[in-house]
Structures are given as C-alpha cells and as structure tokens.
Amino acid sequence: MLAVVVYESMFGNTHVVADAIGKGLGEGLESVDNVVVLPVVEAGRAQLGDADLLVVGGPTHFHGMSRPRTRKWANATAQKPKNDLVLDHDAQGPGVRDWLTSLGHGHTKFAAFDTRFKGPAVLRGRASRLISRKLRRHGFEMVAKPESFFVTLQNHLEPGEEARAQEWGKRLASILLSDGVTHAVRDNRPHPRRCDGRGDDPDPG
C-alpha cells in the first residue's frame, strides 16, 4: 500500500506536521517505503502514482486556504527585524488551493489537515475543511474527519502537536489497512461563514 502526504508550509510548522504524519503512517504500515511526503511544488500527478491514501494539508490563512496575497504577507512577516521566523524551503511555491484546482478527478481515499491558531473553528476557520470539500468535489473519498494542529501566536508549533500528528498518521494507517469503505465519513456540519480577512491576521504555518 502507498500513502502520499502533500503539504504547503510557510514557516515550517505544516512541514513538521506532514513529516510527523508520514512517520506515523510508516509505523502503521510497517514500512517507510510505503509513504511519500511531498511539498505541493513537487506533487504532480506522476508523483501521486498509485496512491491508496492521499493526505493533504496546509496552513489556515484568513479562515481558509492560503492565497497569493496571504503568502506575500507571510514572506514580509518573516523579513521583519528581530523575528525568529524562517520561511520554509518551498514557501515560494504554489499553494494547496491552486494545486487542488489542477488536480482533476480521482477516487483515492483521502484525509485533510491544517495548522492554525487555537480557538473555535467558526472564528478561526480551518483550511482542512475547505481542502476536504475540494477533494470530495473531485470525487475523492474522505476516510477521516479534517484534523487541525495548533500553532502559538508567535507562529511556532504548540508543544505536543508533532507527537499528536504522528499518532494521527498511525490511525490513518489503521484505516487504510482495514476495509476503507466502512470508514468512509461525511462532514455534514455547516461550513463557517466566509470572511474577507479584513481586521484579522492569517495563521501561516
């Protein structure tokens, strides 16, 4: 079996989470050879290959997935003096939003995750909800509810979140190894109100 983790990361938090999920998947599938972790910029159709599970994640910006203007904001934030934030190696590449648009139709099982500030999702938003919605529209089958991993107000990963991401990866592996059809889930909760982001800070990860 093959699991592919695709991520977008600005300050490295989502990258760390993606790697931890990949590690958990590898432990659950009993082989790291069964797991590939890729930044969005490297995740073409050929790289997805014959994946049995697709895991997609990105930072929450202005209640949803990043846009060019929010990635530009993150870049400017990292350049500020006396700032310990460092842009991820692939931060300048395309975001998950654009990647999903170009992905096309598929039937692969999937799970989605995001990084965001703590707080009610209706106020903070969750990129993972929108990622899941896009993938379902493309025909992919959701096997786990969207998951959030939290960052501090200084845009660093909260303590314990890396380990939690690894455990989530193990749970995804368990789902993949069992009868996936019985684990298919639907996310029928009301979607949060769309927000233009004015007066709010994005949650880059």
Predicted features and spans:
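Glycine-rich phosphate/pyrophosphate-binding loop and the adjoining helix
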Residues: R136-G205
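Residues at the starts of beta-strands that form the adenosine-phosphate
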Residues: M1-L2, N34, K109, E141
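Short, well-ordered alpha-helices that flank and scaffold nucleotide-derived cofactor binding pockets
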Residues: D19, K23-E27, R133, R137, ...
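Short histidine/acidic/glycine/proline-rich micro-motifs that form metal-
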Residues: F11-G12, R116-V122, F150-L153
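A short beta-strand-loop structural module common to alpha/beta enzyme folds
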Residues: G28-G44
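Helix-loop-strand module that forms the ligand-binding subsite of alpha/beta enzymes
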Residues: V40-H138
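N-terminal beta1-alpha1 ligand-phosphate binding loop
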Residues: M1-L29
